[in-house]
Amino acid sequence: TVLAKRENKVVYKDGALAAKVFDECYPKSDILNEALNQARVEETGLNIPKIEEVTKIDGKWAIISTFIDGKTLAELMAEHPEKEDEYLNLFVDIQVKILSQKAPLLNKLKDKMKRKISETDLDATTRYELETRLNGMPNHTKVCHGDFNPSNIIIDESGTPYVIDWSHATQGNGSADAARTYLLFRLNHQEELAEKYMKLYCTKTDTARQYVDRWLPIVAASQSVK
């Protein structure tokens, strides 16, 4: 059964397992890095699907994990709009829990962003400004998901939330992760939800909105390249 189709990859259900199968053109190093990220986050004790195997299926690389039976938080939010605030509360609580973890072997967020900014088509002056701002931001070592949005949370039948898709995970500043989530809502034309999210995140983490805002151009630039 096909669970999801994304660019360059398909996720299949196979009994109690989920297989994420990558196209032949997908870099092997990226696939192995994703598996390694997931294994490292697994060790924090967070609720995530466990990696069972990295293998090849019909000549294509695949990551095999435990299958989580349930609905994504995005689906639940669409089905029960009256519960939006309750779901958003849960969403931010899960993010705060992730950010409270440490995984010292994960790649560093700032290094990844610096590399991404250097790969953009932005002119040298803009790149310099962004890199200077990035260098001036405080160094933290929080576990950052990197693509934290409601479609990457599965709520199982018992109501337990699981976080999936750790391909972008790094260790770094939680406000950069929040800025990324805010931008994902905006890109999805959910402006009202984006504002609600930002207020809730800042309240729950006692973070100044201006501080998260300082990350927005850096995050936007680093996300503009794959």
Language-model features: where?
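An alpha-helical support segment within catalytic cores of ATP-dependent transferases
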Residues: 100-146, 154-157, 162
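ATP-binding glycine-rich loop module of kinase domains
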Residues: 4-32, 39
